[in-house]
């Protein structure tokens, strides 16, 4: 597989997290296995494994616009973090060719104590640009962000919308080879999102590789050619975005049906339990009616005796 052809290559990538029930188990995991190894005993683990990704394979050609879709918790953000190098995979390999600009979690890559201006230079330096190169691009970045005098204020004072404006402006104006965009754009207003999408289309037409993640199916269909569908950390499908989106809709439909089916079962079970409780608490109506009849008969007999006694005296 030639490095001249592909910008991103993901091979058999898996990511496992160790989940501990309590802090003591974490301490046991740190100490006990060492003693067991020294004594040639079978090693025990004091954690549960959670596989955020399992055997994912995915390639993106240079200049291609690719998407990653899936429900919340499917592993999309984990995969992006592995591609950008902020996470290491448990197994598998990642290869990237070119300078990466990534817009991931809101505020990632920014120092909250620095001003917007200072963060522009910080991010430029991280991408390998010198001060003169950043100076030449500064006006374009400030103009696209369009946050006015807030550029001279600490980023920690920014609203989420202002932060994503500056973050996107920095990433797209610094001319990356690979642009990775997560769902952070969702916090921007509709007008700014349109500006972002136009800029993304401009970059991809100029040969920039795009890796785009969004729940907005129309944006994925418009901006990308191929997509990867993830579900519960597993690779479901890779192919044309239009075909992958159809599979994604089917998956959502199946999950929705499953949810409402379970909900209906829970409601039916709850209703039946309430009926059973009501039946158990009912008073013995038959016994009460019988007692009332006996009392009524006794009263009639008493009145009859009184009448008979009166007639005898006369």
Q: Where is each model-derived feature located?
A:
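Conserved H-loop
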Residues: 215-222
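ABC nucleotide-binding domain "signature motif"
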Residues: 90-98, 235
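The feature captures the beta-strand-to-loop junction immediately N-terminal to the Walker
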Residues: 69-71
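Localized sequence-composition bias
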Residues: 202, 223-229, 236-314
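Conserved ABC nucleotide-binding domain
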Residues: 131-156
């Amino acid at each position: 597989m030639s490095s001249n052809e592909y910008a991103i290559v993901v091979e058999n990538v898996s990511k496992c997290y160790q989940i501990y029930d309590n802090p003591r188990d974490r301490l046991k995991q740190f100490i006990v296995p060492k003693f067991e190894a020294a004594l040639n005993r079978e090693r025990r683990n004091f954690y549960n494994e959670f596989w955020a990704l399992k055997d994912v394979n995915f390639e993106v050609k240079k200049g291609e616009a690719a998407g990653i879709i899936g429900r919340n918790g499917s592993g999309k953000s984990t995969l992006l973090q592995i591609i950008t190098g902020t996470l290491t995979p448990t197994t598998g390999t990642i290869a990237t060719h070119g300078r990466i600009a990534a817009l991931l979690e809101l505020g990632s890559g920014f120092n909250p104590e620095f001003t917007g201006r200072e963060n522009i230079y910080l991010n430029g330096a991280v991408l390998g640009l010198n001060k003169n190169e950043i100076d030449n691009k500064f006006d374009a970045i400030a103009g696209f962000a369009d946050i006015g005098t807030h550029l001279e204020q600490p980023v920690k004072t920014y609203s989420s919308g202002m932060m994503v404006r500056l973050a996107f402006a920095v990433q797209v104006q610094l001319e990356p080879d690979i642009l990775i965009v997560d769902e952070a754009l969702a916090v921007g207003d509709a007008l700014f999102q349109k500006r972002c999408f136009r800029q993304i289309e401009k970059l991809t037409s100029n040969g920039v590789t795009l890796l785009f993640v969004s729940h907005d199916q129309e944006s994925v269909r418009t901006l990308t050619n191929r997509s990867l569908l993830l579900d519960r950390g597993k690779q479901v499908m890779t192919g044309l975005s239009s075909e992958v989106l159809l599979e994604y809709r089917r998956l959502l439909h199946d999950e929705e049906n499953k949810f409402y089916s379970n909900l209906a079962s829970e409601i039916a079970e709850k209703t039946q339990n309430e009926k059973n409780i009501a039946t158990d608490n009912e008073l013995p109506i038959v016994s009460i009616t019988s007692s009332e009849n006996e009392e009524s008969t006794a009263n009639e007999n008493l009145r009859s005796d009184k009448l008979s006694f009166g007639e005898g005296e006369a």
